[in-house]
């Protein structure tokens, strides 16, 4: 009988499929994985500790840099925790804007995941297609916040500002004709809501394109079907949330089970898998993009018909307008004090969670009555998913490690924090 010699293999952190700085120490027996030991900490930046030394409103930007593909969803969890401490509720228009931007973020995340996952297992065309649509949504980010990635758009008590009436346009260039320029700017003549309306009309056809490339592709199915399945019971025990939990057949979604923002006012479905394998997790995320379009469309229609304030009318947390600040010395002082010293919150502890694209993103805040947190604890979904790597990959091939990591959709900004 042939004997296999076991050996140890380092997968990452310098590996194109490691999704950041993941280091997996694999114990191999031939091509089969006998054990996988994830090593984390290579992207540790002490976010939770840094937040303890800054006023509440100065730590919003740190949240963007946790899961740096799901920026506004991270902000949402943090500002919800602050709002719970303060006992305030944002205006309804702000709630709808948050809901809409959360779903824009979900599509952004899933497009990045689908392109990267496809590239990992050899489907390069999907990568080129997904980034075409992703660029449109990055422009929405830029229009509402001024930044393409680290938006810092949400605020305790609402959002930074109302949705702008104009979308950024492409400038003339020597590399594109006037006809191409007109076509590229066709949907950008109106407001952000007009642009999103147009996006919602054409994006389902784009998702159909992705599915044409992948869903019934025999190579794609050979790489994903029956790879690293997890049962519903075991997924719950392992602390899975988001698409991984729903891919295993558990219909748990905070947007439905514990509604926040305007999710109880919009209609959408929760996609659920059957087999809990990598292929089901793929199907769940693709269907989530379709459901996000439904939610965005409903939010756009409501926001068109219902103008109103986007920040709570409370000078304790809301700065004066720019006009007031430039006309009135007291408003200028108020603005300066608010952004340098912040505001004190009542003593207590709260936990606030949102359904981020990767799962439940939670923020646990402890206040001692000061203007900065006594303790901030972030509950990132990817941390729990990565912890199950060893159990999920045992007995599978080395090539399946790449499939599993892509299927988990790990981002190390939130794992290492």
Curated annotation (Swiss-Prot):
NDH-1 is composed of 14 different subunits. Subunits NuoB, C, D, E, F, and G constitute the peripheral sector of the complex. Coiled coil: none annotated. It comes from the Bacteria. This is NADH-quinone oxidoreductase subunit D. It comes from Halorhodospira halophila (strain DSM 244 / SL1) (Ectothiorhodospira halophila (strain DSM 244 / SL1)). Disulfide bonds: none annotated. Gene3D superfamilies: Cytochrome-c3 Hydrogenase, chain B. It is found in: Cell inner membrane. It holds the Pfam family Complex1_49kDa. It is a peripheral membrane protein. Its main location: membrane. One of its GO terms (cellular component) is plasma membrane.
């Amino acid at each position: 009988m042939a004997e296999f010699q076991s050996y140890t293999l380092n997968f990452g952190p310098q590996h194109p499929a490691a999704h950041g700085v993941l280091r997996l120490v694999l114990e191999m027996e031939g091509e089969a994985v006998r054990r996988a030991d994830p090593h984390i900490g290579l992207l540790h930046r002490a976010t939770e500790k840094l937040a303890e030394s800054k006023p509440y409103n100065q730590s919003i930007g740190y949240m963007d840099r946790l899961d740096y593909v799901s920026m506004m969803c991270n902000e949402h969890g943090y500002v919800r925790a602050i709002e719970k401490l303060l006992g305030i509720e944002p205006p309804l228009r702000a709630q709808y804007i948050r809901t809409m931007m959360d779903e824009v973020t979900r599509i952004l995340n899933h497009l990045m995941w689908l392109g990267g996952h496809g590239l990992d297992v050899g489907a390069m065309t999907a990568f080129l297609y997904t980034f075409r649509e992703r660029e449109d949504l990055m422009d929405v980010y830029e229009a509402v916040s001024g930044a393409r990635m680290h938006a810092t758009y949400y605020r305790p008590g609402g959002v930074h500002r109302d949705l702008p009436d104009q979308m950024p346009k492409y400038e003339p260039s020597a590399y594109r004709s006037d006809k191409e320029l007109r076509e590229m700017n066709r949907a950008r003549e109106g407001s952000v809501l007009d642009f999103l309306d147009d996006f919602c009309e054409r994006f389902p056809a784009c998702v159909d394109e992705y599915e044409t490339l992948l869903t019934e592709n025999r190579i794609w199915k050979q790489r994903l079907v029956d790879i690293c399945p997890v049962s519903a019971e075991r997924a719950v025990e392992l602390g899975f949330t988001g698409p991984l939990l729903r891919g295993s057949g558990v219909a748990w979604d905070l947007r439905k089970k514990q509604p926040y923002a305007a999710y109880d006012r919009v209609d959408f479905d929760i996609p659920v898998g059957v087999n809990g394998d990598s292929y089901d997790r793929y199907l769940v995320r693709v269907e989530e993009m379709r459901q996000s379009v439904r939610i965005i469309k409903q939010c756009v229609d409501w926001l068109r018909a219902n103008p109103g304030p986007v920040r709570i009318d409370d000078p304790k947390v809301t700065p004066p307008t720019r006009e007031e600040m430039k006309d009135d010395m007291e408003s200028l002082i108020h603005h300066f004090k608010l952004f340098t010293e912040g505001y004190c919150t009542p003593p207590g502890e709260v936990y606030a969670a949102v359904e981020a694209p990767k799962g439940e993103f939670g923020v646990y805040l402890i206040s001692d009555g000061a203007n900065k947190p006594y303790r901030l604890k972030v509950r990132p979904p990817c941390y729990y998913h990565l912890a199950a790597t060893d159990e999920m990959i045992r007995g599978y091939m080395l090539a399946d490690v790449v499939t599993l990591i892509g299927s988990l959709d790990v981002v190390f900004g939130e794992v290492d924090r």
